[in-house]
């Protein structure tokens, strides 16, 4: 069994769990993000995800880091970790974005990737005066967008007359250090999201879900016809970890976090969600601490329990775990010291 890769969500909107945790700031800051990434490298994490929002979706009065300038700065401030920047195609013309990505690819010496997100938080789009396309059309837009971006990354001289974009005789240099181009991650729970991932993505991002749901999802996505591609589609999963010496201690901490998170005002977030987004339709089915599934993945328990569950996900086809913690620093260090070695032992035996 292959060893999994571990990553962290950069807390670009403050924190990843309860908004009012006494040990963590509510507002985001670049200096904190930089410290966490550098510590993550030292702890053995090999990738990181920087979500993209113009305004803080949890509370629009709180600070929100800008994704792409943060990605460029973190690329310079780090040595080994993969930098994944989320991108909502509605916010950037593909030519401009392709050029920006190539520059961060150069800064990072080939450690840069993108996470394609077709947008779900309406206020940041509509307040900017941008047309918030219907759900399925956003994926059509994203498909044309990413195909144009990838052609430019490959160094092609591009002539495109599409539904959304017209580009004439354009080639970008210098080309990509990452070959054939920076990796494309893509997540979503709708049929259009799955179809686009099968056609254009290198890695499909899964929201944290119970193991049986993840197994079924991977089986279904693997059945979707894939465009000609040098590699099969890989799978990554988000999760929020609560690990302690015993299952009882972990459950006690989880209940404390759940109680804190229960006091969060989510009305602003939910009012801004596109009602057609499947992920949010599933929230009631999979209640959790953390975003994008969080603790619904079941990584709550003793160090041995969490390690066994990670090994089960690896066996199901997940090779990358994008993790959230709270408090972030201490829990990330705990995971590195206690859980990573146990997973390694289990996967080596398997």
What are these language model-derived features?
Residues 40, 44, 74, 104, ...:
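Conserved, mostly hydrophobic/aromatic
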Residues 95-109, 113:
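Active-site-proximal alpha-helical scaffold in enzymes
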Residues 4-8, 48-50, 82-85, 112-116, ...:
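Hydrophobic faces of well-ordered beta-strands that scaffold small-molecule active sites
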Residues 16-31, 86-95, 178-189, 241-244, ...:
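Active-site mouth loops of central-metabolism enzymes
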Residues 61-84, 141-145, 333-350:
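Alpha-helix-loop-beta-strand connector modules within alpha/beta enzyme cores
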Residues 77-80, 108, 199-205, 317:
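Glycine-enriched alpha-helix->loop->beta-strand junction motifs that scaffold or abut catalytic
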Residues 1-77, 161, 179-182, 281:
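N-terminal beta1-alpha1-beta2 module of alpha/beta enzyme domains
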Residues 2-4, 8-12, 42, 128, ...:
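An alpha-helical appendage that flanks or caps ligand/catalytic pockets
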């Amino acid at each position: 069994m292959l060893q999994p890769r571990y990553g962290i969500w950069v807390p670009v909107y403050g924190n990843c769990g309860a908004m009012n945790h006494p040990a963590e700031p509510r507002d985001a800051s670049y200096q904190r993000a930089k410290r966490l990434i550098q510590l993550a490298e030292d702890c053995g994490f090999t990738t990181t995800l920087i979500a993209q929002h113009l305004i803080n979706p949890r509370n629009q009065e709180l600070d929100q880091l800008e994704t792409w300038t943060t990605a460029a700065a973190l690329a310079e401030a780090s040595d080994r970790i993969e930098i994944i920047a989320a991108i909502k195609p509605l916010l950037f013309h593909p030519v401009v974005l392709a050029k920006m990505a190539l520059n961060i690819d150069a800064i990072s010496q080939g450690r840069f990737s993108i996470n394609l997100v077709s947008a779900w938080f309406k206020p940041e789009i509509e307040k900017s005066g941008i047309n918030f396309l219907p759900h399925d059309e956003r994926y059509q837009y994203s498909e044309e967008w990413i195909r144009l971006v990838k052609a430019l990354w490959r160094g092609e001289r591009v002539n495109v007359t599409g539904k959304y974009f017209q580009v004439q005789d354009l080639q970008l240099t210098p080309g990509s250090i990452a070959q054939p181009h920076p990796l494309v991650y893509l997540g979503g729970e709708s049929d259009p999201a799955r179809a686009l991932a099968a056609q254009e993505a290198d890695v499909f991002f899964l929201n944290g879900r119970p193991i049986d749901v993840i197994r079924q999802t991977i089986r279904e996505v693997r059945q979707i016809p894939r465009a000609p591609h040098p590699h099969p589609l890989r799978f990554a999963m988000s999760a929020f970890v609560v690990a302690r010496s015993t299952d009882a201690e972990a459950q006690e901490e989880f209940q404390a976090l759940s109680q804190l998170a229960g006091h969060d005002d989510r009305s602003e977030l939910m009012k801004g969600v596109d009602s057609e987004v499947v992920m949010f339709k599933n929230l009631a089915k999979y209640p959790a601490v953390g975003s994008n599934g969080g603790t619904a993945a079941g990584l709550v328990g003793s160090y041995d329990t969490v390690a066994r569950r990670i090994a089960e996900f690896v066996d199901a086809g997940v090779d990358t775990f994008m993790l959230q913690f709270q408090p972030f620093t201490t829990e990330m260090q705990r995971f590195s010291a206690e859980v990573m070695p146990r997973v390694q032992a289990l996967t080596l035996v398997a």
